[in-house]
Amino acid sequence: MNIKSLLLGSAAALVAASGAQAADAIVAPEPEAVEYVRVCDAYGAGYFYIPGTETCLRISGYVRYDVKGGDDVYTGSDRKGWDKGARFALMFNTNSETELGTLGTYTQLRFNYTSNNSRHDGQYGDFSDDRDVADGGVSTGTDLQFAYITLGGFKVGIDESEFHTFTGYLGDVINDDVVADGSYRTGKIAYTFTGGNGFPAVIALEQGGEDVDNDYTIDGYMPHVVGGLKYAGGWGSIAGVVAYDSVIEEWATKVRGDVNITDRFSVWLQGAYSSAATPNQNYGQWGGDWAVWGGAKFIATEKATFNLQAAHDDWGKTAVTANVAYELVPGFTVTPEVSYTKFGGEWKDTVAEDNAWGGIVRFQRSF
């Protein structure tokens, strides 16, 4: 064997080995394209598509801190010091389109803290411990305030009663229900019809709610029933609701009108009547047969809004509240509020003092 043959044989072997190794090599697949979060603007600001779906999600919430002093305008008692409360609320909205309309959900979790010098503040909801803070103390709790599903005009889950939501709330004040107009949170099945003529209507079957002292939930299979009709236009709106309390077998009704005087100034007035002249019921919780509420809202500047509410019921309770909501920077609002309650008539013997003056300052960061 000569040198030339040896070199040619070695080269051929080397080429064959290289080809075999190339045939056995693992080829890495091409990387998949990264699917970044997409903005969903079909349902308003803050929504984005859940990756891999056509469902839009929005996460929002607020952090709030309240400081209260003076009298308790709900009971007439002297606080004898500062009452404080904090809340972190976290909200989730989802929406997607189906052949039956928009399919949506809404949930709200509340994490509450209350440190009272003198009394329990029911405004901060359910507490996880058993300590009674009526005479002072600290309490904390977590509350699932809302959890419902919507499909078109259909709604089912935990929400606030249509007795409130359909007509509207009692003004943009903190102490809005000193003259109460019914319990709020309830399990319900509701349907709202919205025609093209500006006349939405609602029908709801409700479980009933509860507060610190009373339980208004149904005691059998028969639900509470709420029905309502509304007309809305550029000038404002007028709405009415009728509710049947299946526990006490009585009914209550409210009629409300809102008028936009200008694009910065609006007023509203609401009257109510109950066939059962007692606050111990699910809907007509004012004193006596009737009650009336009224209020105004004035947008003074881009940062400051003035709110006023006044109310009176058949038993002689009169309540007035005013505040200024001032937005220091976008998303952060400070609201000082002053309230007065006169306990007259049949209310006089149920409270510590006939006249109560109270104040509150709320700090809230919304996101």
Curated annotation (Swiss-Prot):
Name the membrane topology term: Multi-pass membrane protein
- What note about domains is in the entry? Consists of 16-stranded beta-barrel sheets, with large surface-exposed loops, that form a transmembrane pore at the center of each barrel. The pore is partially ocluded by a peptide loop that folds into the pore lumen.
Provide the family line: Belongs to the alphaproteobacteria porin family.
GO biological process terms on file:
monoatomic ion transport
Q: How does it assemble?
A: Monomer.
Query: Which InterPro entries has this protein been placed in?
Result: Porin_alphabac
- Chief location of this protein? membrane
Please provide one cellular component term from the Gene Ontology annotations of this protein: cell outer membrane
A Pfam family this chain is assigned to: Porin_2
Q: Which GO terms describe its molecular function?
A: porin activity
Q: What is this protein called?
A: Porin Omp2a
What does the organism's lineage look like at the top? Bacteria, Pseudomonadati, Pseudomonadota, Alphaproteobacteria, Hyphomicrobiales
